[in-house]
Structures are given as C-alpha cells and as structure tokens.
Amino acid sequence: MFKEQETRMITVFGEGAVKVSPSTVHVVLSVVSRGTELGEIQQENARRMNQVIQSLQKAGVAEASIQTTDFQIRPVYDYVNGEQRFQGYEVINSIRMTSDELSRTGEFVDLAVKNGANQIGSIEFTMPNSDKHYQRALVLALQDAETKMITIGTSLKLQNRPIPLKIEEQHTSQPVAFRAVAMADTGKTPIESGTMTIRASLQVKYQIV
C-alpha cells in the first residue's frame, strides 16, 4: 500500500541591516503662555511665535518649511484641600520646522528659544528614500538565511540542498536617529544626527529532500 512521505522542514531566520545617514530633520517648537487675562496672553503668545518664525526665516528656513501643528487654549486649575480653583488660562502654539541642513539643527533650536520658544516637542531625523534602503536590507536578510541553511545542511550531511518553500517577512520597528548632548561650554546646543540602521528580518522554511 502506498504511503505518502512526510515532508521534512527546517525553519531559519535571516537578518539584514543597512546603515545610512539621515537627510532631513524635523523639529517641533512651541510657545507656551499662561495668565489670567485670555486676550493678553493670546496676544503675547502670538507675538512671541511670530518672532520665532521670523528669526528662523531670517536664518534661511523657507516659509514652506514651517507649519503650525497645534494650537490650544485651555483653562488651568489648581486643587486646594480637594477644591478646584481657577488659576487662569494656558495658550500653546506649536510649529514644525523642516530642514535639510542637519548640521545647523542646534543653531535653529537655540535661535528659536532665544526668540520666545519655551518648549521643544521633538527632534526627528528621517530619510525620503527609506524604502530603497529597506529593500537592500531584505536582500541581506535572505542571504543570511541562505548561509545559515547551508551551514545546517553541511552539519546534518544532507545529500541534497534544501528547497525554500515559504518566505515570511518579520515586521521590525525602524529607529529614528537622534542624539543630543548637554549644553556645551560654547553656549550652543550640540545636536548630532548620527546614523540610522534600517533592519529587515525574514523567516524562511526549507524542505529537506
């Protein structure tokens, strides 16, 4: 009686990584104002934010590279002996600045703070062509899996080379390159873009024949 031969499988994981330098920086800058007279703090907040924007534009940041991302007006309360007491209002105005002059990031931050910004929301370095680098990492991951399979096959003294039957992409989070250090003796804020590592991971199932 014919008996179907059981399929023998080996699963290996391959990983690939590509290091690249980011090309764009995004900085979120905010002006936060507090007071009891809403009209006054709105005007003060607007004046300071306009000053921040104008200073960045004078430094070479294009108008199209500065975008308002958030504007809030909210009441501020304090709690004394379990009782809620009105303290005033808080106005928050945030912008997102984009630049390809990564070496000037610290300069832009210092300039914004000098002209009225009092909160730095985030500093993010990115690449416009990250998909291209990820494809390279995938190729390296597949090569890594193949190398591992050859090593396993040699160790097991397999007569035939295993056949890849299924390749599954494993999702991995991509880190954002950002490195900042404390204020230097020069009084400037040093911010370094560093490098970004694009990673890819694959699960490959091989059939042993």
Task: Briefly describe each language-model feature range.
Residues 1-115, 119-209:
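Short, charge-dense linear interaction motifs
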